[in-house]
C-alpha cells in the first residue's frame, strides 16, 4: 500500500518528494515474501492505489465526455485501476519465479528488482504511457536536461536504480556500508544534477522564435455538443473565441503573435474544403483576414474517404486561406 501512496503522491502534478524511494516499500515486501501469490497481491495493490490517486480524472472524463452517470463513471475508474498497470504485477511474478528457479542470492535479487520493473514498464502496453523520468522535468531539477542523451525513459530507469541504492542503504543501515551507500547516492545526485545544469548551459542560442497567442474559451462540454449538432450556442461559442482573440491581439501590441492557437474542437462547425464559405467558416476566414494573424484551430473535419466527420486540426493563413 505504501508504494502505491508514494508513487501516486510523487507524480505530476505533485512534487516528486518520494521519487527516489517510492518503490522501496514494495521491494522490501517482495524480498521478505516467499509466496509468489503474495508477491502478486502486493504488486497489484500498489498499482491499484497509485492508479486511484494519479488517474482519478478517468472518472470525470467518463462522466463528462462519456456522459455516464457518476456511479458508472466511478465503476469505470475502479476497473481501470484494477487492470491499468499490470506491469508491476508481471514484474513481481517474473522476479519471484527467477528468484525461486535460479536460487538467487540476496545481491542478485536486489539487482533484479529494478531490471524487471524497468523492462515490464517499458514493454507492457499502457493506456496512458508514463514513466518516472517526467517528474524530473516537472520539478525543474537540472538533471532533466540529460534526457537529451538518454531520453525520459532513461531517466525513469535511472530513478529505479536510485531506489535500489536507497534500498541497499536501508538493508545495511546498521553497518558502515549503509552510510557509504547513502553518501555515494547523495554525491551521485549532486554530480548528476550538475551535469544536467552544464548540459543546459551548453545549449546553443535559438536562431528563431515564434510568438504564440493561446486562446481558451472555457466552453462547457455540453455547449460544444449542442453547438456541433446545431442545437444552439454556435453564435455564443464563435463570438467568445473572436472576442478573446481580439483582446489578446490588442494586449500584445507591437509583439504581435505569429499565430493564434484555439484548442481541440473549439470551432463549432464542420470545416470542409469544398464549403469554405459556409456561415461560420466564412466568418472565421473574415476574422483571420481582418486580424491579419494566422490561426491553428481544432474543429470537426470531414474524412472524404470514409465520408464521416472526424476530429481534426486546421491551419488558416493570414489571408484566410486554408493550408
Model-derived regions: residue spans:
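Soluble catalytic regions of membrane-associated enzymes that act on cell-envelope
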Residues: 196-323
Amino acid at each position: 500500500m505504501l508504494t502505491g501512496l508514494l508513487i501516486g503522491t510523487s507524480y505530476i502534478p505533485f512534487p516528486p518528494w518520494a521519487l527516489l524511494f517510492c518503490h522501496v516499500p514494495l521491494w522490501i515486501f517482495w524480498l521478505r515474501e516467499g509466496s509468489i501469490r503474495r508477491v502478486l497481491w502486493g504488486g497489484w495493490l500498489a498499482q491499484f492505489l497509485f492508479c486511484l490517486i494519479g488517474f482519478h480524472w478517468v472518472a470525470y472524463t467518463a462522466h463528462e465526455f462519456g456522459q455516464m452517470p457518476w456511479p458508472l463513471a466511478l465503476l469505470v475508474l475502479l476497473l481501470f485501476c484494477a487492470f491499468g498497470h499490470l506491469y508491476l504485477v508481471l514484474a513481481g511474478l517474473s522476479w519471484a519465479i527467477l528468484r525461486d528457479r535460479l536460487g538467487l542470492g540476496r545481491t542478485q535479487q536486489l539487482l533484479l528488482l529494478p531490471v524487471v520493473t524497468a523492462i515490464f514498464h517499458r514493454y507492457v502496453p499502457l493506456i496512458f504511457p508514463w514513466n518516472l523520468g517526467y517528474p524530473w522535468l516537472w520539478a525543474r531539477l537540472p538533471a532533466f536536461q540529460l534526457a537529451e542523451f538518454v531520453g525520459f525513459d532513461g531517466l525513469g530507469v535511472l530513478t529505479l536504480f536510485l531506489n535500489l541504492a536507497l534500498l541497499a542503504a536501508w538493508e545495511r543501515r546498521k553497518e558502515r556500508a549503509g552510510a557509504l551507500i547513502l553518501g555515494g547516492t547523495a554525491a551521485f545526485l549532486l554530480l548528476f544534477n550538475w551535469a544536467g545544469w552544464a548540459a543546459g548551459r551548453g545549449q546553443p542560442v535559438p536562431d528563431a522564435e515564434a510568438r504564440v497567442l493561446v486562446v481558451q474559451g472555457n466552453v462547457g462540454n455540453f455547449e460544444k455538443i449542442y453547438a456541433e449538432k446545431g442545437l444552439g450556442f454556435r453564435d455564443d461559442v464563435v463570438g467568445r473565441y473572436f472576442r478573446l482573440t481580439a483582446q489578446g491581439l490588442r494586449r500584445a501590441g507591437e509583439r504581435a503573435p505569429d499565430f493564434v492557437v484555439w484548442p481541440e474542437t473549439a470551432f463549432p462547425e464542420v470545416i470542409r474544403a469544398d464549403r469554405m464559405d459556409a456561415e461560420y467558416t466564412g466568418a472565421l476566414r473574415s476574422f483571420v483576414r481582418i486580424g491579419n494573424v494566422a490561426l491553428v484551430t481544432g474543429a470537426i473535419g470531414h474524412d472524404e474517404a470514409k465520408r464521416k466527420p472526424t476530429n481534426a486540426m486546421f491551419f488558416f493563413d493570414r489571408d484566410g486561406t486554408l493550408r
